[in-house]
Amino acid sequence: MGQKVHPNGIRLGIVKAWNSTWYANTKEFADNLDSDFKVRQFLTKELAKASVSRIVIERPAKSIRVTIHTARPGIVIGKKGEDVEKLRKVVADIAGVPAQINIAEVRKPELDAKLVADSITSQLERRVMFRRAMKRAVQNAMRLGAKGIKVEVSGRLGGAEIARTEWYREGRVPLHTLRADIDYNTSEAHTTYGVIGVKVWIFKGEILGGMAAVEQPEPAAQPKKQQRKGRK
C-alpha cells in the first residue's frame, strides 16, 4: 500500500510555520508541551461553534500569547470583549503564567482546510448525502481561487454495512512539491452508523522564496505628507 507523508509536516520550515513557537530547556520542555496541549484542548472544546481554523501559541518571557484564527471573531470576542476575557483567565490558570489572547480573522473560510472539513462533517451529521457535501465544498473552493482541492471521506458511507473510502478532486494537488502551499486537515463526523473521517487538501499555489516569503511583514502605513498651500 502506498503510504503518504503528512503534507504539513514535510513542509515545516520550508513554506509552513509551526503552531507552537518557543524555546525551553530540558526541564521546562515537557511542562510547556503539556500546557500547550491542555490550552488547545480547552479552546477547541469551548469554541466548537466559532469556526476555529488554528491556534498558534507563543511564549515570550514567562508569559503565553495565544492567537486564535477564526472565521467568526464576533463569537470568540463576545459582547464588549467579555468572552475573550474569560478565555484569557482560564488560559492563564492552565499555563500558570500571564496570558494574552489575539484574534485573527479567516477572510476566506472556503479556502481553509480545517473549516472545509468541519463544514463537511457537520453536513454529514445532519444526514446530507456525502457526495453532495463533497462536491459543494470543492466547487466553493475552486470558485474562490484555489488551484486544486481533494476531499476524501471514509467510513460507513450512506449507512452501508461495509466501510469504504471515496474521494473527489478538482484541479491539481502536488503533494511532493515542497514549495507548493498545500493546506491539509482532517475532521470526524459522529453519525448513527459510526464515525466518518474527512480529509481535505487545498492547493493555493507555489511559494517562491521559502519561509522569508511566508513571514514577510506587511508594509506599515506611511503618514500622509501635508501639502503646502501655494502662494496666491
Curated annotation (Swiss-Prot):
One of its GO terms (cellular component) is cytosolic small ribosomal subunit. GO terms for biological process: translation. The keyword rRNA-binding applies. Residues 39-107 form the KH type-2 domain. InterPro entries: KH_dom, KH_dom-like_a/b, KH_dom_type_2, KH_sf_prok-type, Ribosomal_S3_C_sf, Ribosomal_uS3_bac-typ, Ribosomal_uS3_C, Ribosomal_uS3_CS. It comes from the Bacteria. Gene3D superfamilies: 3.30.300.20, Ribosomal protein S3, C-terminal domain (3.30.1140.32). Transmembrane segments: none annotated. This is Small ribosomal subunit protein uS3. It comes from Yersinia pestis.
